[in-house]
């Protein structure tokens, strides 16, 4: 087990897909920590549109400009992943009041599971406060333009998913 380091933060999520809101949060967190680990959760129960490997690759591409940011997939309990990474901070984004109740419950549970780790909430920049991966997936599934919400590589990945489902 690693010792918690307050200079290392884990930003977990499904990132199905990574959005400009996620990227904004990492852009703002990267200068605050020596190391930021973006933990891409396997989450098969959520029925992700993109495979874990694809989500990791898209996040790596989107965040490549940061030398202190690494992207890792994980399929364990978040508390175990955070300890494995030696992190002392768990980053979470809060878009709206509607996110707060869920995030508060998760932070409380994580405090019991990993008491040595603090949860830090960051709010998005205003232009990203309405973006969610689920909305992006739904717009893309229905053939809408998501280019204002995600990087070009994600637009292409979602187009490929839509085409493969149309052929199935």
Curated annotation (Swiss-Prot):
Its cofactor is Mg(2+). Pathway: Cofactor biosynthesis; coenzyme A biosynthesis; CoA from (R)-pantothenate: step 4/5. Substrate binds at residues 14, 46, 78, 92. Keywords: ATP-binding, Coenzyme A biosynthesis, Cytoplasm, Magnesium, Nucleotide-binding, Nucleotidyltransferase, Transferase. SUPFAM superfamilies: Nucleotidylyl transferase (SSF52374). Its EC number is 2.7.7.3. It catalyses: (R)-4'-phosphopantetheine + ATP + H(+) = 3'-dephospho-CoA + diphosphate. The record marks 22 as: Transition state stabilizer. The keyword Transferase applies. InterPro entries: Cyt_trans-like, PPAT, Rossmann-like_a/b/a_fold. CDD domains: PPAT. GO terms for molecular function: ATP binding; pantetheine-phosphate adenylyltransferase activity. GO terms for biological process: coenzyme A biosynthetic process. One of its GO terms (cellular component) is cytoplasm. Disulfide bonds: none annotated. ATP binds at residues 14-15, 22, 93-95, 103, 128-134. Homohexamer. NCBIfam families: coaD_prev_kdtB, cyt_tran_rel. Reversibly transfers an adenylyl group from ATP to 4'-phosphopantetheine, yielding dephospho-CoA (dPCoA) and pyrophosphate. HAMAP family: PPAT_bact. This is Phosphopantetheine adenylyltransferase.
């Amino acid at each position: 087990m690693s010792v918690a380091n307050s200079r290392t933060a884990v930003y977990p999520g499904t990132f199905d897909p990574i959005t400009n809101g996620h990227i904004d949060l990492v852009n703002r967190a990267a200068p605050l920590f020596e190391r930021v680990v973006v933990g891409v959760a396997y989450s098969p129960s959520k029925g992700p549109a993109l495979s874990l490997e694809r989500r990791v690759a898209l996040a790596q591409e989107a965040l490549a400009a940061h030398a202190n940011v690494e992207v890792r997939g994980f399929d364990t309990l978040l508390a175990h992943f955070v300890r494995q990474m030696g992190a002392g901070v768990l980053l979470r984004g809060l878009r709206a009041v509607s996110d707060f109740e869920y995030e508060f419950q998760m932070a409380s549970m994580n405090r019991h599971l990993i008491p040595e780790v603090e949860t830090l909430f960051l709010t998005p920049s205003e232009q990203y406060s309405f973006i969610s991966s689920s909305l992006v997936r739904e717009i893309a599934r229905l053939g809408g333009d998501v280019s204002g919400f995600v990087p070009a590589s994600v637009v292409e990945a979602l187009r490929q998913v839509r085409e493969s489902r149309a052929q199935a």
